Amino acid sequence: MSMTDPIADLLTRIRNANLAHHEVVEIPASKIKKSIAEILKSEGFIRDVEYIEDNKQGVIRVFLKYGEDRNRVITGIKRISKPGLRKYAKADSLPKVLNGLGIAIISTSAGVITDKEARSKQVGGEVIAYVW
């Protein structure tokens, strides 16, 4: 069975595992999913990410991060641009998530980057998701 929106599936798996206080979640791999997971790691939302090669498409293993008393680091994660309704933003109108406390993940000509990087490089693109 084919999946309509694999990025939404990635975000939903992370959101559900986070809400259930799981330590690890495994997700079917793709290039854009790897990029999104690496951004979440570099921004400190997840502890680690590793790619496991199988003889099909591979698996991304995401290690979730929790604070003191098992408080969630990821408070919210939301898909913005969907297959049925794409959302684009120019470099000067990129969104700020929670006044800069969260990040927007943007797919640009320079690759998949955060809103802060896109502003510094002066590139716009498709607004994939918000994470806070």
Swiss-Prot record:
Query: GO terms for molecular function, please?
Result: rRNA binding; structural constituent of ribosome
Q: Which GO terms describe its biological process?
A: translation
The answer on whether this UniProt entry bears the keyword Ribonucleoprotein reads: yes
| Gene Ontology CC entries for this record | ribonucleoprotein complex; ribosome
Name the family the entry cites. Answer: Belongs to the universal ribosomal protein uS8 family.
Taxonomic source organism: Leuconostoc citreum (strain KM20)
Keyword Magnesium: yes or no?
Answer: no
Matching PROSITE patterns, A to Z? RIBOSOMAL_S8
Q: What does this protein do?
A: One of the primary rRNA binding proteins, it binds directly to 16S rRNA central domain where it helps coordinate assembly of the platform of the 30S subunit.
Taxonomic lineage = Bacteria, Bacillati, Bacillota, Bacilli, Lactobacillales
Annotated protein name in UniProt = Small ribosomal subunit protein uS8
Parts forming coiled coils: none
